[in-house]
Amino acid sequence: MGVRKIKEKPNVCKKGDKVRVIAGKDKGTEAVVLTALPKVNKVIVEGVNIVKKHQRPTNELPQGGIVEKEAAIHVSNVQVLDKNGVAGRVGYKFVDGKKVRYNKKSGEVLD
């Protein structure tokens, strides 16, 4: 049993993007992307999808115990916000010979 291969899509969300969660238990939450995982089309968003992990004692955490941390959510469950706070889908276009991301709803360039 290996890892299922998923067709890799262009990076819609990048580290540092402000996003709004549009599905799941944290629907409506606006937060910052901590990590983008393009190979599995997921992102880790600050304060969203908190899970409890049973941590074995280590040098950093000598007592071990139950630790709460953010888990990855699928990139289709978030929308990127532009500078005005408008959530929309992300598209790509060329500006001055450079490929940039833009918000399809507002037309504002994200990069």
From Swiss-Prot:
Q: What is the protein name given in its UniProt record?
A: Large ribosomal subunit protein uL24
Taxonomic lineage is: Bacteria, Bacillati, Bacillota, Bacilli, Lactobacillales
Q: Which PROSITE patterns has this protein been placed in?
A: RIBOSOMAL_L24 (PS01108)
Top-level division of the source organism's lineage: Bacteria
Q: What is the similarity comment for this entry?
A: Belongs to the universal ribosomal protein uL24 family.
Give this protein's Gene Ontology molecular function annotations: rRNA binding; structural constituent of ribosome
List UniProt keywords, sorted A-Z: Ribonucleoprotein, Ribosomal protein, RNA-binding, rRNA-binding
Which Pfam families does the record associate with it? KOW, ribosomal_L24
Q: What does this protein do?
A: One of two assembly initiator proteins, it binds directly to the 5'-end of the 23S rRNA, where it nucleates assembly of the 50S subunit. One of the proteins that surrounds the polypeptide exit tunnel on the outside of the subunit.
Keyword Protease belongs to the record = no
Description of how the protein assembles with itself and partners: Part of the 50S ribosomal subunit.
Q: Which InterPro entries match?
A: KOW, Rib_uL2_dom2, Ribosomal_uL24, Ribosomal_uL24_CS, Ribosomal_uL24_KOW, Translation_prot_SH3-like_sf
Output the Gene Ontology cellular-component terms: ribonucleoprotein complex; ribosome
Report the HAMAP family cross-referenced here: Ribosomal_uL24_B (MF_01326_B)
GO BP terms in the entry: translation
